[in-house]
Structure formats: structure tokens, C-alpha cells
A protein has these predicted regions:
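Extracellular/lumenal mature domains of secreted and surface-exposed proteins
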Residues: 1-193
Length: 193
């Protein structure tokens, strides 16, 4: 004969349920600029228990386990930063700041003109921008006129002019100056024997 028994056991005790920490952080320095860019991060996570572990992901392959790291971004790009905190109970929390870091390559300004010397009383000069890196441009033609074009042309009157090109990406700025570069209405000095 088959007999069925109902065995039951009961346990007395407490089941502890812990609140998870709330992962949060701030950036205490410039979050955009030229590479290399040094960025100061501060953990401001909330918890009822002590946090025992920090796992930072800086978005460029770099990581840290310090509570308040300072990180050096050495490549250009836009980066998201994440922090996972673990409290003494083993509870974890993740926070991410998307696209929070912008690192730019420093532009290197340079240019040439198609004409730098002319005997004419006026001359249309075309400039070729040879700047390394993408940038915004400000030209100063030396006669009170400016331009923001990449490769501008400018009509010069009689005189000698210094020309400047300012290239900027965010807060990264480079200036290139050619002093006394454009000479219009100059006389040729020829000595014939």
C-alpha cells in the first residue's frame, strides 16, 4: 500500500532586506577641453550602510576603483561615464552620465596666400587654409577686415599687411601669424649694369 505523508517544517528567524545604495557622482572640473584633459570625479552616492567598492568606467577604456578619482583623457572624443557602487551588504547601484565628457584635439593653424607680392594698386588675394584638425576659423587680414570662411579671398589696397588665422575647437585655440606677408603696390628694385 502507498502512504502519503505530509511533512512540513517551519523556521523561525529574520529575513533582512536591505535598501540598495543610490549611485551618484559629480564632475568637479571642466568636462570639455583639449587633450590631454584632466577630469576630477566625486562620488556623492547615498546609502544607509557604508560603501566598500567603487567601479568607475570613464568611457574610453579607462577605469578606476578609487572613491574620488582624477582621470586623464588622452584621446579625443565624446565619452559617457559610469559608476557602480557596492555597499557592505553587497547591494549595488549603477549611475551613468551620458556624453558627459568632450575632449578635443588641439588644432594647428597654418595658411598660405596665392599672392603675397604685387605691383598693382589693389589685389584680390585668396588664402588656402592648411590647418590640421577640424576647427572654426577667424581670419584677421591686417586692414581692419575679418572673415570666418575656411578659405577666404580678400581685396587688398596699397600697403603691407600682416595676416592672422585663429583656429579653435571648443576651448582649444591656436593662432598662426604671417608678419608683413602681403605687400601690394610694391616697386621692383632692379639694377641693370
Amino acid at each position: 500500500s502507498n502512504s502519503i505523508t505530509n511533512d512540513s517544517k517551519s523556521y523561525n528567524g529574520l529575513i533582512n532586506v536591505f535598501n540598495s545604495p543610490i549611485s551618484e557622482f559629480t564632475i568637479n572640473s571642466l568636462a570639455n577641453g583639449c587633450m590631454p584633459l584632466l577630469v576630477d570625479f566625486e562620488d556623492i552616492s547615498l546609502t544607509n550602510n557604508s560603501i566598500v567598492n567603487w567601479q568607475w568606467d570613464f568611457g574610453d577604456g579607462g577605469a578606476s576603483s578609487f572613491q574620488n578619482p582624477i582621470y586623464d583623457y588622452t584621446s579625443d572624443g565624446n565619452f559617457s561615464v559610469s559608476l557602480i557602487v557596492t555597499d557592505a551588504n553587497g547591494c549595488q547601484s549603477l549611475s551613468t552620465q551620458l556624453n558627459s565628457i568632450d575632449v578635443y584635439k588641439m588644432p594647428v593653424a597654418n595658411f598660405l596666400a596665392d599672392i603675397s607680392f604685387s605691383c598693382n594698386q589693389t589685389e584680390l588675394v585668396t588664402f588656402t587654409n592648411n590647418t590640421l584638425g577640424l576647427a572654426n576659423y577667424s581670419w584677421i587680414f591686417g586692414d581692419g577686415i575679418t572673415s570666418n570662411l575656411v578659405n577666404p579671398s580678400h581685396n587688398y589696397a596699397l600697403g603691407v599687411y600682416s595676416v592672422s588665422l585663429i583656429a579653435n575647437v571648443g576651448t582649444c585655440i591656436d593662432t598662426f601669424v604671417r608678419n608683413n606677408y602681403i605687400e601690394i603696390g610694391a616697386e621692383l628694385n632692379s639694377d641693370f649694369i
